């Protein structure tokens, strides 16, 4: 490699130092007619409330990428380990044996994204079925999760892939409507769905892989959405309690790690303020094609009801004998790390802190201290629901662990102007998240295709932040991974040569080791997103995260990528980790860049770049 090219690679992350078995015969059984189909308009007013999010996308040109994705990833540079060199400064080596003996190394998926089997399996319809079929133009290339990647029928083979990776954990979600097609027990239990999850859990355990279950990963039963508006109505709390209790009693003797919700902030903001994800609600001024919604009120109502539903599920968990003997329950929150755009600006420093409170603190403060962050109480004011004294007291005891999804960082600076007549989450936040910095010592910032700065040191920082600010909880990293755009131009060999993703994973594992050793963070596990390529929500199948490449054009065959091969060797104790592109030494100012990127400026936005995760 040319010296000039290598020099370009060695430039950024200066910031990088730092869940009573039921009698099946007694259960009400739904008929096939009850389940219905998604084809054609449903004659209910709720369907008319689903808004348009993204215009038609029929090709794979750069212009088709959603503006909020921030960047597109160009041709990947062909690099070898010899090009890496070593980190100048204090040497820090990590072996698999350096992690605690009970540490979990695993992969993550969610039901709608991978399972498929929408028809003929008894599963009821979800808000995402509605979202993708009533308005296919909202999803890249008109994609949907009808087939996913056929995990429902291939799970045994996919567990073999996990074994190939030498992982000992697998995080998945349970589809509410695969168990309760209409959302409640009295309306019918789908025994085939119950059997599927029992078989999956048993197969995992038979292969030495610990299951970790998320109860809600953005799939709201369509029947409940149509009946009373889903999470817009507090009635959802008791229905979620019933669903959670069913799962604890059915699977809790074998599943010991439970999470109630995945990324409730994204579900609230993207689904009810931006209209970008199911159920696609927002104010007209936010997106003209949103037929109904209130961006100023609904995200906070939905978030509050998710917190109350979490509390109800925890109450059931604490009283369930099936989960006694080591069972834990928590929640999975997403947060970026935020640095001030200008490190010498006190206002930018405050903006970075404010961003953490609005993204992470929005849920973690009430779940730790019983109340919302002070900044939100002051600024969102009467639009933010209050907790009763009893709720606040219970909330303080409602987490056995914190699940963290971490993908990268942003630079923060205050918004110059806010329209007080058009309030939403972003105007309440009053912070611009950008990939641009005034720090001239950081010449080449590497971003992902979804517009997030790759910043492993941010993981160390946010783990330390959670330890210091939230009573030193046990933490599991439930998602961490790197995306890439599928232009449809690569052959299998090229598509599985993911050098950048390999370095991304290596760097974050190294950072985890530092966090455990140096900061004494109580980190218990690390799950990579994702085991394999899958349906990535409104980005469809165009964005890929998998350790395994899935060939959608050839019977969904799976092929291990370079990142998966490296992980397998590391977990088999054949790799010593001490050098990574994305992890460097602050004093030496490393800023490695692996991809050519083209920035796409969002249209009509107050924000320079906004992550699709919010």
From Swiss-Prot:
Residues 1-26 form the signal peptide. Belongs to the glycosyl hydrolase 1 family. One of its GO terms (biological process) is carbohydrate metabolic process. It comes from the Eukaryota. Pfam families: Glyco_hydro_1. This is Beta-glucosidase 33. SUPFAM superfamilies: (Trans)glycosidases. A beta-D-glucoside binds at residues 113, 217, 262-263, 407, 479, 529, 536-537, 545. It comes from Arabidopsis thaliana. It is an enzyme of class 3 (hydrolase). The keyword Transcription does not apply. Disulfide bonds join 282-290.
